[in-house]
Amino acid sequence: MYLKLLEEAGRLMKQAVADAGYTVEDMSLVESQHADVSSSLPFRLAKELKKNPKEIAAAIVEKMGKSEYIDRVEATGAYINFYASQKYITDSLKEILSEKKFFELEPNGIKVILEHTSANPTGPLHVGRGRNPIIGDTLARLLRAGGYDLEVQYYVDDMGKQEATIVWGYDHLDRIKPGKPDTDKPDHEIVEVYRAATDLRKSDEAVEKEISEILNAYEHMDPATAVKFREMVERCLEGQKMTLARMNVFYDRFVWESDFVRDGSVNKAVKKLAESQYATTKDGALALDLSSFGMDKEFVLTRADGTSLYTTRDIAFHVWKLARCDRAINVLGEDQKLAMQRLNAALSILGEKKAPTIVFYSFVSLPEGRMSTRKGVVVNLDDLLDEAVERAYVEVDKRRKDIPEEKKRQIAEAVGIGAVRFDIVRVAPEKSITFKWETALDFEKQGAPFIQYAHARCCSILEKAKPGEYDASMLREPEEAALVKKIAMMPYVIKNASTELKPHVIAIYARELAEAFNQFYRVSPVLIAEPELKEARLALVEASRKALAASLGMLGIAAIEEM
């Protein structure tokens, strides 16, 4: 409904601007803290026409027409402010409650491939890069709600030297002494084998040679070697998928790096790049001179023995991917910026007209306690999730002595996982983040538990009384109108967040929505109100429940009914 309000404000504004004698296309309409819709157009016109912006604003408002959704329009200084009418409130509540897909935009026909996480299959996911699946999955949920035809991909790096090291390690377990993981998850077992084999590789040239031979055999698709690689990588992926599923992160397709070697795509790309004017060779290795693209270092494509590198195979993957979508989006750590510049240059040399859109993120750090990342120790994401759930359990147990133990554990799991997801996604991806327990598990205002609690409160009210026929005109308190307006804004928020690829925007909105509901709840008793008013407020509680559930859903957080 807010999109309709913007449309109405734009229609009135365009006519008034023309009637006032100005010629402008962009009306500069935005949401505002001081009004329902605001325009700063007078500032822009004042700069162009060398006139007083306040006088321009007054002249435009004087010509303003009428709309059933707009109660009044005011010139406040140089701003033009629009205020929604009661009919807008009434119609918004009706549409929120009656429209099953109110929180989804119409399909736009744009095919998007979103790739995220794509961690090396060498062990468990760790906290530093734990931001990737959370950002990626939130973007996926936003893009789907935004009407995009989306496929979420995980690119499986199954051909690197790290993977060859693990294959060698499993073949020579009698020569290495892997540590014993404190869990049955296969990715934790894999990393112990990898560490032990790596230590031996560094100290024994013969081992290094054997690992190189294994990698070479795999690149040339030796059947027996290929089976070993696939088994090892799938085993590690199994453990990583368990972690991701626990965080409500899922994928449509796992794309294997080796497939692009097997089907000749890598050789085809290398051949074409080798024939380009940018190709150079040194000691048998093929590289690209990218100085004309503003990069000093050469981009190495193959080793001296002719085997390809990860970056080469990544080029073939992107050629394949770009041919299958209108837009490709990658979620990557900020340390990959140079690699992506080189990739885009190579794609340009190959004649690609499109390039992937990259959402870069800064890494997550843990500042205190036994899980501190400042000590240079890699902290597994599994450990962070376990810690979050245990801390959440303490809070739940403190508040709910009346419920069974199993129920407490279920709530703690939902609250703990939600706390991690929300605290990581609430900050813009490009900004660094320090994970703090006191913020993440804040039941009062800052964290996901605050939003989950608002949803649970809605469910508790609705369990006692179901909404029936209602008269929305009974909702006259400012907090009631503010809550309806906040709910009605969600499609607008989805549109902006999905278009601009800003997952933190929906997190901020969800928290503001929970706050708006709490403000309403504080001033507007529901169950003890007079019958007609009670029905109207119950309808608003149901609308709030739907909106809170939808916003939590887009954040990948469980909308629990009891806390």
Curated annotation (Swiss-Prot):
Gene Ontology annotations of biological process type: arginyl-tRNA aminoacylation
GO cellular component: cytoplasm
Chain ranges for the short sequence motif 'HIGH' region as given in the UniProt record: 119-129
Localization per Swiss-Prot or TrEMBL: Cytoplasm
UniProt entry tagged with the keyword Disulfide bond: no
Gene3D superfamilies: Arginyl tRNA synthetase N-terminal domain, HUPs, Isoleucyl-tRNA Synthetase, Domain 1
InterPro entries: Arg-tRNA-ligase (IPR001278), Arg-tRNA-synth_N (IPR005148), Arg-tRNA-synth_N_sf (IPR036695), ArgRS_core (IPR035684), DALR_anticod-bd (IPR008909), Rossmann-like_a/b/a_fold (IPR014729), tRNAsynth_Ia_anticodon-bd (IPR009080)
EC numbers on record: 6.1.1.19
Entry keyword set: Aminoacyl-tRNA synthetase, ATP-binding, Cytoplasm, Ligase, Nucleotide-binding, Protein biosynthesis
GO MF, any single term: arginine-tRNA ligase activity
Annotated CDD domains: Anticodon_Ia_Arg, ArgRS_core
Reactions catalysed according to its record: tRNA(Arg) + L-arginine + ATP = L-arginyl-tRNA(Arg) + AMP + diphosphate
Homology family: Belongs to the class-I aminoacyl-tRNA synthetase family.
Name of the protein: Arginine--tRNA ligase
Species of the source: Methanocella arvoryzae (strain DSM 22066 / NBRC 105507 / MRE50)
Gene that this polypeptide is encoded by: argS
